Structures are given as structure tokens and as C-alpha cells.
From Swiss-Prot:
Its EC number is 4.2.99.20. Pfam families: Abhydrolase_6. Coiled coil: none annotated. Monomer. This is 2-succinyl-6-hydroxy-2,4-cyclohexadiene-1-carboxylate synthase. GO terms for molecular function: 2-succinyl-6-hydroxy-2,4-cyclohexadiene-1-carboxylate synthase activity. Keywords: Lyase, Menaquinone biosynthesis. Pathway: Quinol/quinone metabolism; 1,4-dihydroxy-2-naphthoate biosynthesis; 1,4-dihydroxy-2-naphthoate from chorismate: step 3/7; Quinol/quinone metabolism; menaquinone biosynthesis. It comes from the Bacteria.
């Protein structure tokens, strides 16, 4: 079994750019950014429970990493960058810390490196279970209307929230709930030490209005790019800013 993905081929000899979307997104999420890099071959992945991979279920991050590796092999991707947003960024960091063959580097936008104590993990588990129950049982428009009121999305205006609620409500609530629980921050290890000891290139992007993740970025041994005029979802709010940062990263 492999993950559903869309592949776009570029020039031979350059590494692939493998894009991983955030929770409730799909393979289209990164394409406005990715298509600015037509020289590179691009793979836009649907994570389990999402888009064309909605029927694929996992028990945890190890399953996701295994599926991602099988997917890369199926496309004969031997050299690649992982580029992930939020959940996709956490998947990228988890996979990269398992020393993937062929990995050139990781670019994470607004991805959490992991909670640092049992109390935080217990609180997050309670929260994610409550959200998962809502995703399973309530209309998605109602759930996402509340989802986008969370503090991390404070920089969104009303029009942006309405647009996101309409877009995300096309998902399957049950499969979102399953993926939310399987990849909860409550079950993700703290990756700070692994990332500090890494052997791969590591870059971190965050919106200038995303105070939570700017603070987290400061804790990581990563080259951080702050995206102007953007909050947590920087590649959606300022795609040109993210394109500029990614172009700078890939030039090294």
C-alpha cells in the first residue's frame, strides 16, 4: 500500500521536492508554492485519512513513515527534500529523524517538535480526543468553525476563516478523527535532541504573526525564516514569501 500523490516532473539531476500538507488539507495545499519550482520534480502527497488517501488508516507515526517511504520508492525517488506544514511538518521531522536514505534536507513550516512533559501530553490527549469525537459526530462546518477560533489561528480574518471552513468541510470526519488521534502531539516524542544531532539540512519557516511557533523555532537548532504578513498558515497567507524563502534554501 502507498499513499495517493500527484507527481510533476522537472529536470533530471535535481532532488525531488516532497510536499506534506497540514491536518485537514490535501495534495493541492502546497501546489501554488511548489509550481514555482518547475525545474524540480515535485510530489504532492495525501496523508492518511485525507484526500485520495482517506481510506488509509494508521496506528501512529511509524505507520505514516513506512507508508511515506514505500510511496517514495514507488516513484523511484532517490534524492529528495521533505517540505511539510503543521502536521506535515511533524511527519517530516519524525521521518527525517529515522535517517531516511536519500534525504537532502527538511523544510518545516509551523510544525511542533514535541511536548516536553507528561502533563502537557495528557492535556493534549484530552483536547485531541474531544476534537476527534466532534469530527466523528458533528457536521464538519460546525466543527471547523470552532477549530479556526483556536489561538494559533488568531491572525485570520473572518473572510479567511469562512473560506477555510468551506474548504476543509469537504473532508471525511471519521478519517480525520482517526488521523488526529494516531498522530496527536500527545503521542509524538520530543524531537529537539534528535534534531540537534541531525545529519541533514533543517530549515524552519513561520509567519511573523505566529507568536507560538516563532517561540518554538527559537528552541530549535534550525535556520529560521520568518514569513512577513503571515500567521500560522504562512504558505496560504503569503505564498510569495514562502516561495522566496524556499528558493533561498534550495540555492545552498
Amino acid at each position: 500500500m502507498i499513499l495517493h500523490a500527484q507527481a510533476k516532473h522537472g529536470k533530471p539531476g535535481l532532488p525531488w521536492l516532497v510536499f506534506l500538507h497540514g491536518f485537514s488539507g490535501d495534495c493541492h495545499e502546497w501546489q501554488e508554492v511548489g509550481e514555482a519550482f518547475a525545474d524540480y520534480s515535485r510530489l504532492y502527497v495525501d496523508l492518511p485519512g485525507h484526500g485520495g488517501s482517506a481510506t488509509i488508516s494508521v496506528d501512529g507515526f511509524d505507520d505514516v513513515t513506512g507508508l511515506l517511504c514505500k510511496t517514495l520508492v514507488s516513484y523511484n525517488i532517490l534524492n529528495f527534500w521533505l517540505v511539510g506544514y503543521s502536521l506535515g511538518g511533524r511527519v517530516a521531522m519524525m521521518a527525517a529523524c529515522q535517517e531516511l536514505a536519500g534525504l537532502c534536507g527538511v523544510v518545516v513550516e509551523g510544525g511542533h517538535p514535541g511536548l516536553q512533559n507528561a502533563e502537557q501530553r495528557a492535556e493534549r490527549q484530552r483536547s485531541d480526543r474531544q476534537w476527534a469525537q466532534r469530527f466523528r459526530t458533528e457536521p464538519l462546518t460546525a466543527v471547523f468553525a470552532d477549530w479556526y477560533q483556536q489561538p494559533v489561528f488568531a491572525s485570520l480574518n473572518d473572510d479567511q476563516r469562512r473560506e477555510l471552513v468551506a474548504l476543509r468541510s469537504n473532508n471525511n470526519g471519521a478519517t480525520l478523527a482517526a488521523m488526529l488521534e494516531a498522530t496527536s502531539l500527545a503521542v509524538q516524542p520530543d524531537l529537539r535532541a534528535n534534531l540537534s544531532a541531525r545529519t541533514f539540512a533543517f530549515y524552519y519557516l513561520c509567519g511573523e504573526r505566529d507568536s507560538k511557533f516563532r517561540a518554538l523555532a527559537a528552541e530549535l537548532a534550525a535556520d529560521c525564516h520568518v514569513i512577513p504578513r503571515a500567521g500560522h498558515n504562512a504558505h496560504r497567507e503569503n505564498p510569495a514569501g514562502v516561495i522566496a524563502s524556499l528558493a533561498q534554501i534550495l540555492r545552498f
